């Protein structure tokens, strides 16, 4: 299968997987126009849409795409049922698309019903995990998001993390503010800065590398613990995650 990213709005990415026959899967189409343009340019035949959550910049293009291609099956969590979803899926279930099984993983935090889709090596994680960061807590709690990130971090090392936004540079600036002397973070920041200076995409990322540079996945890391302990003593990794998320919200 081939993985494609379609830019939308200011910083969204709509992901498309296509097979050799031209059948394709579309993930979180917030805007129909760039997707329709890509379909026409590549002669794709849309088979399915995956929705991760109900926010408009992820679902806004569904109606127009389904009108154009009525055969499309739209998978999504319960919270997207009024956004065009025709097949509601939940944690532990699978979606069989393009000849592959995609596992559905519940990842509450950004929204209460947020889900991710995984079929090795592809992880479509919406607004749960970003490179160098994680989603804001609009509906869920820090505890929920911490548990959700733990689920994703436990996936295989070679997982390709397909996030829905180009937030990597700002996330790495935050990471440097927390761990300014970390070699992995500094190296990755320089790489990302160069890519963005050329207006190039920083995604997808390999999960093994992401675990090294994403402070939200390093809550049991001794260097991070020492930094947090300079300000406040927090015994549990979940508490350290909440501290980080609060810091990022104000960054």
Curated annotation (Swiss-Prot):
Binds 2 Zn(2+) ions per subunit. Its cofactor is Zn(2+). Belongs to the metallo-beta-lactamase superfamily. Glyoxalase II family. Thiolesterase that catalyzes the hydrolysis of S-D-lactoyl-glutathione to form glutathione and D-lactic acid. The lineage of its organism: Bacteria, Pseudomonadati, Pseudomonadota, Gammaproteobacteria, Enterobacterales. Zn(2+) 1 binds at residues 53, 55, 110, 127. It holds the Pfam family HAGH_C. This is Hydroxyacylglutathione hydrolase. Monomer. Coiled coil: none annotated. It is an enzyme of class 3 (hydrolase). Zn(2+) 2 binds at residues 57-58, 127, 165. It catalyses: an S-(2-hydroxyacyl)glutathione + H2O = a 2-hydroxy carboxylate + glutathione + H(+). Keywords: Hydrolase, Metal-binding, Zinc. Pathway: Secondary metabolite metabolism; methylglyoxal degradation; (R)-lactate from methylglyoxal: step 2/2. PANTHER family: HYDROXYACYLGLUTATHIONE HYDROLASE, HYDROXYACYLGLUTATHIONE HYDROLASE GLOB. GO terms for biological process: methylglyoxal catabolic process to D-lactate via S-lactoyl-glutathione. GO terms for molecular function: hydroxyacylglutathione hydrolase activity; metal ion binding. The gene is gloB. InterPro entries: Clx_II_MBL, Glyoxalase_II_hydrolase, HAGH_C, Hydroxyacylglutathione_Hdrlase, Metallo-B-lactamas, RibonucZ/Hydroxyglut_hydro. Its EC number is 3.1.2.6. HAMAP family: Glyoxalase_2.
